[in-house]
Regions:
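Flexible helix-coil transition and linker loops at the boundaries of alpha-helical arrays
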Residues: 103-107, 141-151
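Long, contiguous interaction/recruitment modules in multidomain scaffold/adaptor proteins
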Residues: 2-111
Length: 205
């Protein structure tokens, strides 16, 4: 679905800034689009008091803001606020919202490590490599590390290496790829290590 807003549509005087994406939103349609296409971000506390205030005062949607306040104070699953917004704004069809609800449910069925990896991968795709590393390392720092397979652990270290390479911190990238190879002898990992030595001759195999 392509987001297309009429130039004659109501526009708030103070757009809402979503720091994680580095964008401003200025309509309920844009908010729904962001939520629908970034479910992990929506699950990570996107809907807070500041956003609810924006919905009430800038979008002039007091009824929706009131429903969100009630849900927030009731102690219900915070993710219900996501669905309230999608349902009340009528930007997506009931079928689309149903598919989105299934996507959220699939995330909730994941283990803590798997969900954290999905979140890290999300930030990696956004090229927010520093944030991605924080989430990848959170998995490794967790005591559950002993229950992770060597294959999964190798993937985490590989992605840490790719993240560091993305910010040109080649020494850190080399160390991470080395760790990945220690857990799983993968030829692709060796290729990445070799490529790093070409980018930085001071690094050695």
């Amino acid at each position: 679905r392509q987001l297309s807003i009429s130039v004659t549509a109501f526009r708030p005087s103070h757009p809402y800034y979503i720091e994680r994406l580095g964008i401003h939103i200025a309509s309920s349609q844009e908010l729904c689009y962001v939520i629908y296409n970034n479910p992990l971000l929506a699950m990570e506390g996107l809907i807070n008091d500041n956003l609810i205030t924006f919905i009430r005062t800038e979008l002039d949607m007091a009824f929706l803001a009131g429903k969100l306040d009630v849900c927030k104070k009731s102690g219900e699953d915070p993710d219900e606020m996501i669905f309230i917004i999608l349902q009340e704004c009528y930007y997506y069809t009931a079928r689309e919202i149903g598919k989105f609800r299934q996507k959220i449910a699939s995330y909730k069925k994941m283990s803590a490590a798997e969900l954290t990896k999905e979140t890290a991968d999300f930030y990696f795709r956004l090229k927010q490599y520093g944030t991605a590393v924080i989430y990848y390392e959170k998995i490794l720092d967790d005591w559950r590390i002993k229950s992770l397979s060597d294959e999964f652990t190798a993937k985490i270290w590989n992605n840490i290496g790719a993240s560091y390479a993305g910010i040109f911190w080649f020494e850190k990238a080399m160390s991470a790829f080395d760790m990945s190879y220690n857990f799983q002898k993968n030829r692709e990992t060796l290729k990445k290590i070799y490529q790093l030595t070409l980018l930085n001759p001071e690094l050695t195999l």
